[in-house]
From Swiss-Prot:
Amino-acid positions noted as binding S-methyl-5'-thioadenosine in the UniProt annotation, renumbered to this chain: Q33, E108, D140, G141, P165
CDD domains hit by this protein: AdoMet_MTases (cd02440)
Keywords, in A-Z order: Cytoplasm, Polyamine biosynthesis, Spermidine biosynthesis, Transferase
Gene Ontology cellular component annotations, sorted alphabetically: cytosol
Domain PABS: 9-238
Keyword Ribosomal protein: no
Organism whose genome encodes this protein: Escherichia coli O81 (strain ED1a)
Function (record text): Catalyzes the irreversible transfer of a propylamine group from the amino donor S-adenosylmethioninamine (decarboxy-AdoMet) to putrescine (1,4-diaminobutane) to yield spermidine.
Protein name: Polyamine aminopropyltransferase
Compartment list: Cytoplasm
Positions annotated to bind spermidine: H64, D88, D158, C159, T160, D161
Enzyme class per UniProt: transferase
Amino acid sequence: MAEKKQWHETLHDQFGQYFAVDNVLYHEKTDHQDLIIFENAAFGRVMALDGVVQTTERDEFIYHEMMTHVPLLAHGHAKHVLIIGGGDGAMLREVTRHKNVESITMVEIDAGVVSFCRQYLPNHNAGSYDDPRFKLVIDDGVNFVNQTSQTFDVIISDCTDPIGPGESLFTSAFYEGCKRCLNPAGIFVAQNGVCFLQQEEAIDSHRKLSHYFSDVGFYQAAIPTYYGGIMTFAWATDNDALRHLSTEIIQARFLASGLKCRYYNPAVHTAAFALPQYLQDALASQPS
């Protein structure tokens, strides 16, 4: 039997992960990114950008449920949601499950990513691109949040790692723009890497976001594809109470929503804000 081709991730220099490639479905460089989608027996279809795994069919539900349901249920009455990035459609899929949301705007820098994922990762979007509440904007995320006349209750930054095109979504200019178009008591969330390996990302985000929001923190989830420990998600708002809602309040909102999830539940919601001591110490040691 011929040995299977292996795809190696290049996120870290000294160690990493690899996937056996059963079948390459798509591989092409777009104007902005090097995109590959392939099949793996353990994780299903895998998408990688610029040598870094972005999503897999097997475990994407953890990431997308936590990025959407935590801020939306904490907010309690979000009507207008902005997604920055998210071209694979799974973030959109989870937001559309909230029937009280009236509009969902998604800003993606690369139209090619959307078309590729719609064809090759259909389970990610699950038809959500056809939701009448959805609007796609092809634009740079920093430009959009600093120019739009729209305002939003929840902003979800489904950004890549802070390298290449994704770097701009970790800048003060982006955070300032998000504050600009976020409604009072609105919530901003963003992926912030695996904190054991990428601690500086969390520290940098905390420092920058604190210039614009009165309550800045993180919550976490364990996602197998993003190896190295827990993944952290940045959280920023001017309503300090939203990060500290009781499990009972979240439970009532969860039941009213009719959601049925595979990872998220109200107990996970409140527990997710408990951070390991090494991250708490790192954040506390930074100058205010």
